[in-house]
Amino acid sequence: MGESGPVVIDPRRHDAVLFGVGDALGSALASQLGQIGVGTAAFAADGPAAAADRLRVRPGRCVVVAGDPAAVEAARTAGFALVIGLAPVGRDGDGLRGAGADAVVAELEQITVRTGDRRMSQLPDASQALTGGADGLAGRHPAVFFDFDGTLSDIVDDPDAARPVAGATAALTRLAARCPVAVLSGRDLADVTKRVGVLGIWYAGSHGFELTAPDGSHHQNDDAAAAIPVLAQAAGRLRDELGAIPGVVVEHKRFGVAVHYRNAARDRVGEVAAAVRAAGRHDALRVTTGREVIELRPDLDWDKGKTLHWVIEHLRRSGSGALTPVYLGDDITDEDAFDAVRGGPVQGVPILVRHNDDGDRATAALFALDSPARAAEFTERLADQLERGEG
């Protein structure tokens, strides 16, 4: 996050905010956080990591606000998700930046809070989206987008062992005969294409930096391609730095470096996150997080949501007519697509595939399914509906 951009606390990504400054717990910011279910606490000499332990929250899903470079550095070393330096007017913030602050503000009022989302447990079942009504699909022509891991496939300890759940590929094949279908994954394009193996659909890899159309034509983000050698170097350094930690896997992809820590000891996760964030700062790469993974990618304003809009626009120019976007995903990176589906020219249907990895976090989705198996069943039912001419 650059200092020139907005500083946002997002309950989809952040479970708590830890303050190391003055009477911040009595501030309007702290009050607003409490209203949306984001925890708050103060820390002192024992540091932010101890405060996170007391709140029983993970540093990787917490924000630290501190005015002391030592506290900023401690938060950075512990792997906190967002570290905000507070430098009142007249005070130089360079020391906070040098200690690793993601952003520096002059007052708490410069920090904004995302509101309006619901918790995962509050979402109605996606079967309701198959009906009519403002949010339903009856009588509409959909374009359906899927994440892979955690949506079409169960999350497994070994990412290389992931496969579509029973019935998923058959349902995708039937659906693709009736409407545009796309799989948008953080995996490499070749990897996700091979794992799904359904012909006649769109595939996007690396969160949309590279994709193929149903006719086999290939598209890539050329600005992102400039970062390929930098990512390769970062992957090598992270393997050297983290390779001795049991359970950590450094996965080098064409447009990214994913560091998986699902099988690592919990007391090593902060160390892993800190190393990846340091690599991102060193090489000017963007850091994103997911379910037991932290990733480096090109620092460009591109994500699954923008990829979805690009595909919809491509289909429109090809004469598809009005399309209602539907997106099924489970992870934090899928929230960009949920935002895109809700904020596009046509109100779409964002569907979260629920899990327990991040607790009952907030989401921009409007509907939910309880597992990849339920996502496959939903896909089958939608294909049935379209085959009957009810779409």
UniProtKB/Swiss-Prot annotation:
InterPro entries the UniProt entry points to: HAD-like_sf (IPR036412), HAD-SF_hydro_IIB (IPR006379), HAD_sf (IPR023214), OTSB-like (IPR044651), Trehalose_PPase (IPR003337)
Cofactor: Mg(2+)
Active site: 147
Protein's name in the database: Trehalose-phosphate phosphatase
Keywords: Hydrolase, Magnesium, Metal-binding
Gene3D superfamilies documented for this protein: HAD superfamily/HAD-like, Trehalose-6-phosphate phosphatase related protein, domain 2
Gene that encodes it: otsB
Family classification: Belongs to the trehalose phosphatase family.
Organism for this UniProt entry: Mycolicibacterium paratuberculosis (strain ATCC BAA-968 / K-10)
UniProt function note: Removes the phosphate from trehalose 6-phosphate to produce free trehalose.
